[in-house]
Amino acid sequence: FTLIKLRSMRSDAEAGGSKWAEKDDPRITRVGRFIRMVRIDELPQVWSVLKGEMSFVGPRPEVPAFVTMLDKELPYYAERHVVKPGITGWAQINYPYGASTEDARHKLEYDLYYAKNYTPFLDLLILIQTARVILWPEGAR
């Protein structure tokens, strides 16, 4: 499926290939900084949820180039795809913004925990914690 987001980076941001966003990334526009800070860049993904391509809660979908790389570098990375991707997830509320393979390894642990221990109560807990993260935006890039 195609991940829909509000554009927060310059249109040529990935001209040299995909790369993780960094703190104070110069590719992010002024408007982009605001929409990332208030996390509204994710709002269009509700359409993907309504179409059944995503869930509100699940492992965050990743850029295809990163998926290919991480599949090779991280054992069990593909296992995170046994559940639908989500707008928010266990990794997002428990680990700060990741921008490296090592960060992806840590987030994978949370994604696998979620896939193995999914319950409606866990989804509710994640949604409540997501509201906290949106209201007090720590770690947005």
Protein language model annotation of sequence segments:
Residues 1-141:
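Conserved small/aromatic sequence motifs within transmembrane helices
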